[in-house]
């Protein structure tokens, strides 16, 4: 892999050392001009707050719209309990990833290696700590997950805009938003998401509380039923969507590397998750309370919301946020591709953007093939997220500190709430076994079964997934349209 200069990004953490006292923020204090200060304020982020906004914003994107669908599959109680359970589980494995990053960087810096001109990624951490086989494993799962994570954001864009303008079908909207999302090739790195992360979280916060308040004001639909859970296949499909929801930390290493003091990341993801709970639980519970089993055929919560200015505002804000989240998922892929083709040290932002474009093309194509908003989340959660951000980090932590000398010289000791290394091993083993059996095993069976059912029903390259039939829409009374796609 090339160790080129990330030339188009200010070297925010160029002098930062895990083992030392210097931080990259020193580099930003060289220019006191108003223009430079404004640019740094909006464009160059590396603080603890920047990392918190990035984690929270990235974690809670379009899943807000599919969680009510999951509640209809799981039932109210299971939906709430599993959100809390997987939220805490995800926070733990994000903590493990941060510990392994600090360990890798500390070891390399002791050897005299500088990361001033290199963006560290998860597969490189695995390579440095455990060897080339783990590097290949991490690279395969991480890249595939981020690829499909980007696909899901693109599908969500087309699904959402359709509820404002249904003159174009969802496939056409996918073409349009694929071109729009391709502009993320011009965003250099996670340093440069400062203002976008802040705005993105604000937009999702509005959407979450709109869903909750609008559902409560609407009240329960006539004849509403809350039958879930009724079938095992639906139950585990819903559970894996929640596993997917709180598995958004595949970009943890890149977010940490963008920080001025990455060793401060340890509990940031947990703090972000606690805030995310205030968005996901009230909104999903309220929508499910109002519409019940109708959500089983409406994987996008917007489809059941009354059409008005408040809903349109929520749709538009979610579209903007999905563009941001698309960039979050794609940026690590851009880095990998740049290193593969030897363009990571290119100074020209335009040449670098041009080199990144081939990454967007397969994402665009896959979004057109599999436009199944909702079911695809569960499939990705079971088959990719389960390994990428739950099983692999837990196993990697156990193997990294398997020897007494490694534990004694660890850059990060067990956290204050863990009495010993043994307790950490027990918890890590539980995560591996639980996610392997419940997430990948039962979840994989259920989500793939449901996904295949969507393919059989709608076909690949579906022109307008879950759209209302034109004839039915023309004759439906206006009031009834509030409860239809």
From Swiss-Prot:
Changing residue 238 to E: In aux1-104; agravitropism. Changing residue 247 to E: In aux1-106; resistance to 2,4-D, agravitropism. Residues 1-59, 101-135, 194-196, 254-266, 336-356, 400-425 are cytoplasmic. Changing residue 386 to N: In aux1-118; agravitropism. GO terms for cellular component: cell surface; endosome; Golgi apparatus; plasma membrane. Expressed in root and shoot apical tissues. In root apex, confined to stele initials, protophloem poles, statolith-containing S2 columella cells, lateral root cap cells (LRC), and in epidermal cells from the distal elongation zone (DEZ) up to central elongation zone (CEZ). InterPro entries: AA_transpt_TM (IPR013057). It comes from the Eukaryota. It is a multi-pass membrane protein. Residues 12-22 have a biased composition (Polar residues). Residues 12-33 are annotated as: Disordered. Residues 78-79, 157-172, 218-232, 288-314, 378, 447-485 are extracellular. Keywords: Amino-acid transport, Auxin signaling pathway, Cell membrane, Membrane, Symport, Transmembrane, Transmembrane helix, Transport. GO terms for molecular function: amino acid transmembrane transporter activity; auxin binding; auxin influx transmembrane transporter activity; symporter activity. Its main location: membrane. Disulfide bonds: none annotated. The keyword Transmembrane helix applies. PANTHER family: OS05G0424000 PROTEIN-RELATED. This is Auxin transporter protein 1. It comes from Arabidopsis thaliana (Mouse-ear cress).
